[in-house]
Structure formats: C-alpha cells, structure tokens
Amino acid sequence: MRTYSPKPGDITRQWYVIDAQDVVLGRLATTAANILRGKHKPIYAPHVDAGDFVIIINADKVHLSGNKKTQKLAYRHSGYPGGLRSVRYDELLAKNPEKAVEKAIKGMIPKNTLGRQVLSKLKVYSGDQHPHAAQQPVPFEITQVAQ
C-alpha cells in the first residue's frame, strides 16, 4: 500500500475563533501556528497547505509573562542603511495590538511561499467583534496553566 499524500482538493477548511484575553502571547502563537499549518489534522504534510482559518479576538488583552512588556523589543527594518527601528512591547500593544500578535505568529510560520499562503488565513482583531460570523467559526479553547 502506498503512502497517502493529500491533494489541495481533499482538504476541508474550518474556521476557528480564539479569545486572546489573558492568554500568554507565546502559547497563543504556537496554538494558532499549529492550526494555521494544519498540524492538528491527521492528513498533515509539510508541502501542502492543510491548515484552517484562525480568527483571534481581544488581541489588546493578550498577556506577556515576566517583564517582557517593558523589556522585550520588536524590531523592523526599512531596508536603508541605519534603518533599524525598535519599539517596546507595551508601546506596540498600546498602539497596534494586532501587529504584536501577528508578529509572534509570523515568527513560527515558515518563511517561504507556503508560509505566506498560510498567514493569509490569519485574522486578528483587537475587540471582541469580528466580521466573519457568516463562516460559522468554532470557538477554540486554549488550556494553560494559571499565570
């Protein structure tokens, strides 16, 4: 018997909604990255996008453990010499909390064409409302140890 290799037409996608309120950012990112890549499915293959859609709400209420809020820096580069910019995570969460969550998840996804396709299935919102009710998303509970 030959090994089964999933084809793009064989994959059924589901929508999950994750509430990020009081969830540690790293644990949220690993859970979302695994769902986006499809690693929770038995038909997972690294060369096929078998992942599901992920909606993250309450991104502004995400938790960073320890002193990371004041000490951890988020970097970006303009591409010009001397164009490295850094911002503390407490400033980033105050200004653009969606970007902080997207950046954490993006770091856990492969940096190639398939990774960009996987990231297009991620939707992050700072409030508790999202415009994807028509897709009937299923709530996904993140179980974690108390922080």
UniProtKB/Swiss-Prot annotation:
One of its GO terms (cellular component) is cytosolic large ribosomal subunit. One of its GO terms (biological process) is negative regulation of translation. Keywords: Ribonucleoprotein, Ribosomal protein. InterPro entries: Ribosomal_uL13 (IPR005822), Ribosomal_uL13_bac-type (IPR005823), Ribosomal_uL13_CS (IPR023563), Ribosomal_uL13_sf (IPR036899). PROSITE patterns: RIBOSOMAL_L13 (PS00783). Gene3D superfamilies: Ribosomal protein L13. GO terms for molecular function: mRNA binding; structural constituent of ribosome. It comes from the Bacteria. Part of the 50S ribosomal subunit. This protein is one of the early assembly proteins of the 50S ribosomal subunit, although it is not seen to bind rRNA by itself. It is important during the early stages of 50S assembly. Belongs to the universal ribosomal protein uL13 family. This is Large ribosomal subunit protein uL13.
